[in-house]
Regions:
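Short, small/polar residue-rich loop motifs at catalytic or cofactor-binding pockets
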Residues: 1-4, 59
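Asp-based phosphoryl-transfer active-site loop
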Residues: 4-20
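A short acidic/small-residue loop/turn micro-motif
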Residues: 23-24
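Active-site phosphate-binding/coordination module
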Residues: 27-114
């Protein structure tokens, strides 16, 4: 079985310039990855809304990981229901996405920590 490439990248100071938040320097690499059909998965501490905005500007249509791994947002139709269930995944629907929530709700964490 051939190994297929996938790129996981942070945003701040990695894909985006740390001072200007520009991704112009990364644009040629992103274009080449798209040409080669290599998925680029954003992994960040940012929220869904922030990450979704960046993904849209970059033209990325792949899953993205937000809030330091708290959730994975998967575009509809990216994986079949069979692929998800065979992997033991029980996703929720949120807006246009299938979501895997990996963290605990804020109120539950707060009760535990305080």
């Amino acid at each position: 079985m051939a190994c297929r490439a996938i790129v996981f990248t942070d945003l701040d100071g990695t894909l985006l310039d740390s001072e200007t938040y520009s991704f112009e320097a990364a644009r040629p690499a992103l274009k080449e990855l798209k040409r080669r059909q290599v998925p680029v998965v954003l992994c960040t501490s940012k929220t869904r809304a922030e990450t979704e905005s960046v993904a849209r500007k970059l033209g990325l249509k792949h899953p993205f990981i937000v809030e330091n791994g708290g959730a994975i947002f998967i575009p509809p139709g990216y994986f079949t229901p069979e692929q998800l269930t065979s992997a033991g995944v029980r996703p929720k629907r949120r807006g246009n996405y299938v979501v895997l929530e990996l963290g605990l709700p804020y109120q539950q964490l707060r009760r535990f920590l305080i």
